[in-house]
UniProtKB/Swiss-Prot annotation:
GO terms for molecular function: structural constituent of ribosome. Belongs to the bacterial ribosomal protein bL28 family. The keyword Lyase does not apply. Keywords: Ribonucleoprotein, Ribosomal protein. The keyword Nucleotide-binding does not apply. The lineage of its organism: Bacteria, Pseudomonadati, Pseudomonadota, Gammaproteobacteria, Pseudomonadales. GO terms for biological process: translation. GO terms for cellular component: cytosolic large ribosomal subunit. InterPro entries: Ribosomal_bL28, Ribosomal_bL28/bL31-like_sf, Ribosomal_bL28_bact-type, Ribosomal_bL28_sf. This is Large ribosomal subunit protein bL28. It holds the Pfam family Ribosomal_L28.
């Protein structure tokens, strides 16, 4: 399973660990992904999504119905 938010599309990015001596080693910054169940009132069921913390805030703001409509338009499975 890929580490990508289903709502925002955020995935891992690469960068450097920098030590006190300023030695650089490559690393990955991973998104804050959570499996979360959202209640969809119109369908009378829970939908389980893998979303980032930012994705949860978007769902809080726009509503789960609007976000699911966008996911269905993109052909996303959930």
């Amino acid at each position: 399973m890929s580490r990508v938010c289903q709502v925002t599309g955020k995935g891992p990015v690469t960068g450097n660990n920098i030590s006190h001596a300023h030695n650089k080693t490559r690393r990955r910054f991973l998104p804050n992904l959570q499996h979360h169940r959202f209640w969809v009132e119109s369908e009378k069921r829970f939908v389980r999504l893998r979303v980032s913390a930012k994705g949860m805030r978007i769902i809080d703001k726009r509503g789960i119905e609007a976000v699911l409509a966008d996911l269905r338009a993109r052909g996303e499975k959930f």
